[in-house]
Amino acid sequence: MRTSTTSIRRARPADADPLADLFDETWREAYRGIIPGVALERMISQRSSQWWLGATQRSRPLVVVEQESSIVGYAVYGPARGRILQAPGEIDELYIRPAYQGLGLGRRLFRAVSNDLADHGLARVGVWSLEGNERACAFYTGLGGIAIGQAIDRMAGTVLPKVGFRFS
């Protein structure tokens, strides 16, 4: 019998290439048909390995989900970047590779990040999701998130409504 080893840890500079690949795959899966094609390609190209190398060295926490020494997910989080979510903590990004979705890894990553925020006095957490990303909205609702606000992003001349979720 073979068991699978899964860990959640801080990202390291050596993770830059796998994070760039993961970002490319997860964003294409999540946003194809939601974000206009040219804008999506531009965003993906901006998140190169070099960008991720810098992200591993910034003060905002970046953690990865590693399974059998492969990075299959990541999250970026920290103090809230705005006030609309009415929460002191915010998860900026949380993505799991499509082949690993539905296995509980996203839930586990969310809990780990939420616990880390709470350990730093940021017990109430907010997160934004594009309204058209039904899978993400269902994920956050399933975790107990309450939709508390709406806002818009603009990308390549397209208005992208987003919904804010809060967790207590």
Named regions from a protein language model:
Residues R97-A99, L103, E131-G132:
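Active-site acidic-Proline motif in GNAT/NAT acetyltransferases
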Residues V127-A136, R154-V159:
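Conserved beta-strand-loop-alpha-helix junction that forms the acyl-donor binding cleft
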Residues T141-G149:
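Conserved acetyl-CoA-binding loop of GNAT-fold acetyltransferases
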Residues R2-T6, R10-A16, A20-A99, R107-D116, ...:
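Acetyl-CoA-dependent GNAT
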Residues A118-W128:
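Conserved GNAT acetyl-CoA-binding A-motif
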Residues R2, P161-S168:
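Terminal substrate-recognition subdomain of acyl/acetyltransferases
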